[in-house]
From Swiss-Prot:
It is found in: Cytoplasm. GO terms for biological process: ribosome disassembly. This is Translation initiation factor IF-3. One of its GO terms (cellular component) is cytosol. The gene is infC. InterPro entries: T_IF-3_C_sf, T_IF-3_N_sf, Translation_initiation_fac3_CS, Translation_initiation_fac_3, Translation_initiation_fac_3_C, Translation_initiation_fac_3_N. Gene3D superfamilies: Translation initiation factor 3 (IF-3), C-terminal domain, Translation initiation factor 3 (IF-3), N-terminal domain. The keyword Cytoplasm applies. Keywords: Cytoplasm, Initiation factor, Protein biosynthesis. It comes from Thermosynechococcus vestitus (strain NIES-2133 / IAM M-273 / BP-1). Monomer.
C-alpha cells in the first residue's frame, strides 16, 4: 500500500513540473527563441542542442499545438518569475470576513456610537458586518424597537455600507448584514 502512495505522489509532481530538455518526448517541435522570434520546426534533439549552446533550457510551453511549442529560456529565472506572479496574485486576494457587532435594543447612546465606529472600521477594512440585537426573556415582544435600531444603524452607516440583508428575526436575535460600498 505504501508503494502505491509513493507512485501516486511522484506522478502528481511530474505532472506539475513543466517538461524541460530531455523530458520533452515529441519528435518535432516549434522553437521560439529568447527574444520571441521563431526558429522554426525542428527535432527536439536539435532544439535542445541550440539551447545548450546558449547555456539555456528548452521548456515546453504548449503541448496542445501541432507541433508542440517550446521556448528557449533560463528555466530557473522562468520558475522564479512564475512564483513571483503567484505570490503577487495571492497578496491581492482579500477574503472578506464577517465581523459581528452585538447589542441590545435598550442600548445607551455612547455604547451605540461605539458599535457604529467599530462597524465602520470593519467595513473600511473590507469586511462584512453582521449586526445582531439579542433579546432576553420577554424583550422579544419589543422586536419592532430592535428593527428600528438596526434601520437607524443602516442609515448612520450608509456612507460606507449598503444593506445586504434587511433586519430579520432568527430565534432570540434580530440580525442584519451590511457590506462595504464598492
Amino acid at each position: 500500500m505504501t508503494v502505491q502512495v509513493a507512485v501516486a505522489l511522484t506522478k502528481k509532481t511530474q505532472q506539475e513540473q513543466p517538461m524541460i530538455n530531455e523530458r520533452i518526448h515529441f519528435p518535432r517541435v516549434r522553437v521560439v527563441d529568447t527574444d520571441g522570434s521563431q526558429l522554426g520546426i525542428m527535432s527536439s534533439q536539435e532544439a535542445i542542442a541550440i539551447a545548450r549552446e546558449k547555456e539555456l533550457d528548452l521548456v515546453l510551453v504548449s503541448d496542445k499545438a501541432d507541433p508542440p511549442v517550446c521556448k528557449i529560456i533560463d528555466y530557473g529565472k522562468f520558475r522564479f518569475e512564475q512564483e513571483k506572479k503567484a505570490r503577487e496574485a495571492r497578496k491581492k486576494q482579500h477574503t472578506s470576513d464577517v465581523k459581528e457587532v452585538k447589542m441590545r435594543y435598550k442600548i445607551e447612546e455612547h455604547d451605540y456610537n461605539v458599535c457604529i465606529n467599530r462597524a465602520e472600521r470593519f467595513l473600511k477594512a473590507g469586511d462584512k458586518v453582521k449586526a445582531t440585537v439579542t433579546f432576553r426573556g420577554r424583550e422579544i415582544q419589543h422586536s419592532h424597537l430592535a428593527e428600528e435600531l438596526l434601520n437607524r444603524m443602516a442609515n448612520d452607516l450608509q456612507a460606507v455600507a449598503e444593506v445586504q440583508q434587511a433586519p430579520k428575526q432568527e430565534g432570540r436575535n434580530m440580525i442584519m448584514f451590511l457590506a462595504p460600498k464598492r
